[in-house]
Amino acid sequence: MARRKKYEGLNPFVAAGLIKFSEEGEMERIKLSPKAAIAVSAAIIAALIIINLLLPPL
């Protein structure tokens, strides 16, 4: 039987080959505070509600 490599300590996406980087740490992440994330999502929800009220459905 063939041996399987154990991917200990790796992200599942990296282990599955879905992300191909030489190192997992190369991915850049957007740093956003929890308050900012809530504010942005609330603003998007409010904008969608306003658009829905102003524009009649087709």
From Swiss-Prot:
| UniProt xrefs under InterPro entries | Preprot_translocase_SecG (IPR023531), SecG/Sec61-beta/Sbh (IPR016482)
List membrane-spanning regions.
34-55
Q: Which Pfam families match?
A: Sec61_beta (PF03911)
Per UniProt, what is the membrane topology? Single-pass membrane protein
Where is it located? Cell membrane
Q: How does it assemble?
A: Component of the protein translocase complex. Heterotrimer consisting of alpha (SecY), beta (SecG) and gamma (SecE) subunits. Can form oligomers of the heterotrimer.
Name this polypeptide is given: Preprotein translocase subunit SecG
Q: Which organism is it from?
A: Pyrobaculum arsenaticum (strain DSM 13514 / JCM 11321 / PZ6)
